[in-house]
């Protein structure tokens, strides 16, 4: 059963900027209403951890997570790092000039597509902490690879700017089906509107019927 549930957080359908998940835990900001905890547990079938990065609720922008580990940006606070480590995941702070690291890394459990913008010295850390093979590439010539696609072990949903060539490459990299899709009535910033793992997906509440169907086809 792969459920797709529409939600709104802090008055916006851009839920993916606030949440991040793998197959066992979902990161939520401290001020999200309790009822969202239940939706997360029932849909993504994970535990819930309430966290911040640099006191910000933007966990979906400032973390990269898979089933093996979590990457954090340079401005994360020591006490926050301790809370991430308490979850039992590999945790590492990336020594990079970038803060919105989720825009630069599209991470599965075996492979991570990494933006050419990310410093070469950081790539090895990505590989080690997430336990993945690192591939450096763009999507449709855009280096913000983590913002233009979402994935689980079954599929990769990619923004409509992607070419057939992009879809073919991504299918090869991640060994999964790929297709184009949007969220929240035509938005191609997929990471901003979809929070997905192998069990289910949360989507922004502006997501339309055909978008639901495509998400189900590719990721469900």
Curated annotation (Swiss-Prot):
Record keyword Iron-sulfur present: no
Pfam families from the UniProt entry: eIF-6
Lineage: Archaea, Thermoproteota, Thermoprotei, Thermoproteales, Thermoproteaceae
Record-given protein name: Translation initiation factor 6
Listed HAMAP family: eIF_6
Family from the record: Belongs to the eIF-6 family.
Alphabetically ordered keywords of this record: Initiation factor, Protein biosynthesis
Organism (species): Pyrobaculum arsenaticum (strain DSM 13514 / JCM 11321 / PZ6)
UniProt keyword annotation of Protein biosynthesis present: yes
Alphabetical list of NCBIfam families matching this protein: eIF-6, PRK04046.1-1
Top-rank taxon: Archaea
Disulfide bond positions: none
Biological processes per GO annotation: cytosolic ribosome assembly
InterPro entries linked: eIF6
Its job: Binds to the 50S ribosomal subunit and prevents its association with the 30S ribosomal subunit to form the 70S initiation complex.
Any GO MF annotation of the entry: ribosome binding
């Amino acid at each position: 059963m792969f459920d797709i549930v529409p939600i709104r957080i802090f008055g916006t359908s851009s839920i993916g900027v606030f949440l991040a998940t793998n197959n066992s835990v979902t990161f939520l900001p401290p001020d999200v209403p309790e009822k969202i905890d239940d939706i997360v547990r029932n849909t993504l079938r994970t535990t819930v951890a309430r966290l911040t990065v640099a006191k910000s609720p933007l966990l979906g922008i400032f973390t990269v997570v898979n089933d093996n580990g979590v990457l954090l940006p340079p401005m994360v606070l020591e006490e926050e790092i301790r809370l991430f480590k308490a979850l039992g995941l590999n945790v590492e702070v990336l020594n990079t000039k970038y803060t919105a690291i989720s825009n630069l890394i599209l991470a599965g459990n075996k492979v991570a597509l990494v933006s050419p913008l990310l410093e070469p010295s950081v790539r090895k850390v990505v590989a080690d902490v997430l336990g993945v093979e690192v591939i450096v590439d763009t999507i449709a010539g855009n280096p913000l690879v983590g913002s233009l696609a979402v994935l689980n072990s079954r599929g990769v949903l990619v923004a409509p700017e992607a070419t057939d060539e992009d879809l073919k490459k991504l299918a090869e990299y991640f060994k999964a089906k790929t297709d184009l899709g949007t969220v929240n009535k035509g938005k191609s910033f997929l990471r901003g509107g979809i929070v997905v793992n192998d069990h289910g997906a949360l989507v922004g509440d502006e997501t339309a019927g055909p978008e639901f169907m495509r998400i189900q086809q590719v990721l469900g």
